[in-house]
Amino acid sequence: MGGSESTGRKVSFGMDEEERVRVLRGVRLSDEVVNRMKDSNLPSKDQSTSTASGTTSGPTTFPSKAGPSASHSASTSKDGAHKPTARGVGHQYAEEDLYRRYEKEQALIQEELARLAKREREAAHERLSSSVLREKNITSQERRKAEHLPADLDEWAKELEQKEAELQRLNTFYREQLNSIEKKNLEIYKLTAEQFHTAASNAELRVKQRSYDPVCMDLQSNILKCYAENKQERLNCSDLAKEYGKCVSAAQKNLLFNHG
């Protein structure tokens, strides 16, 4: 719609009493309008011919828009005070031609400004339509979210209840397992303590039951007596010493056999 061409262009214009656009600032004419204005500045063949005929045929009547010099020439010609010359007629025609070109340029500018204003209106309409459509989409999305919100809340509540039930079940299970482990540890401790006390009691009984009575007391007394009597000839007591050694060995074997 022409919105892309007018993006970034700021045009300020106003309307006069005849509903014509007057440029204030910020107007950039297109190349087409500039070319048309250049073409309008070049004099046409008809204008050259009419200029030549005007210089040879005498006074000519022109429109009232020719300006003050044309009105003055017409009045002086009517009164008969001064007759128009070729130079005066050429000057008058040049002013009229300049005015006509001015009018044509103004028409081109009016056309260009009208086209720019139309583009600006279309671009503004496009932007407004896009904004309205975007707001409608956002409103529609928010409405759909609001419609689905209660259902989502119910679903979330159910999920939370299920998670709480699962956590409660796991808590109960782990508590039961902990109690079972504590009971087993207590039973093992009691059994170990009982076994320890039993083993200690048995060891104490075994130690108390053992008696270490002197062995071979008669032979020991005889050897001591023999040594005392035969201080210089102790070899005489060798037989008693051998018998004492045999007696001690036999007593050791008997002790190991009974308590082994």
From Swiss-Prot:
Start and end residues of each CHCH domain: 213-255
Sequence ranges of Low complexity compositional bias: 48-64
Lipidation residue positions, type N-myristoyl glycine: 2
Coiled-coil positions: 94-187
A Gene Ontology cellular-component term: mitochondrion
Motif Cx9C motif 2, chain ranges: 237-247
Subcellular location: Mitochondrion inner membrane
Disulfide bridge positions per record: 216-247, 226-237
A GO BP annotation: DNA damage response
InterPro entries: MIC19/MIC25 (IPR007964), MIC25 (IPR042860)
Region (Disordered): 1-92
Subunit and interaction comment: Component of the mitochondrial contact site and cristae organizing system (MICOS) complex (also known as MINOS or MitOS complex).
PANTHER family registered for this protein in UniProt: MICOS COMPLEX SUBUNIT MIC25 (PTHR47609:SF1)
Family assignment from sequence similarity: Belongs to the MICOS complex subunit Mic19 family. Metazoan Mic25 subfamily.
Protein name (record): MICOS complex subunit mic25-a
UniProt organism field: Xenopus laevis (African clawed frog)
Gene giving rise to this polypeptide: chchd6-a
